[in-house]
Amino acid sequence: MNFTSEILKCCYKREEVLKNGLSMTIYNKYFDKMRKSAHILVSEGRQDELLPYLGSESVSIRRDIAGLLYNSYPELCKSIFREISEMTVETGLQKCYTIVVATAIDILKYGIPKDFP
């Protein structure tokens, strides 16, 4: 199974949920799938396959990938979260992505569990 591909599918599905205002239950379902695939990828030492996606134009995908890679590349991911945390609707952020900003702020404040993903 191509875990990188599975992770990206989940990221795109999560973004779709936000854009279309769908249920957070669906959003969280894809989070669980994404996390499980990332756990396997990281345990195989292949987390670097996700690094290019930290540069995605999608704020949602950058946030998801930074969350998955946080414990492997903490300083890099913190810089992504800092960048996202400063985004506002007034500076061009689409309103549907405000939850992404909120989670970035929370991660900067509280961190991510050491055993994640």
Predicted segments with their positions:
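Amphipathic alpha-helical scaffolding segments comprising HEAT/armadillo-like alpha-solenoid repeats
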Residues: N2-L8, V17, V42-Y53, P74-E86, ...
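Structural detector for internal amphipathic alpha-helices that build alpha-solenoid repeat scaffolds
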Residues: N2-Y12, G21-V42, R63-P74, Q94-K114
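Conserved interaction-surface patches within small, structured recognition/assembly domains
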Residues: Q47-V59, G67-L68
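Short inter-helical turns and helix N-cap capping residues of alpha-solenoid HEAT/ARM repeat scaffolds
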Residues: E57-V59, T88-L93, Y97
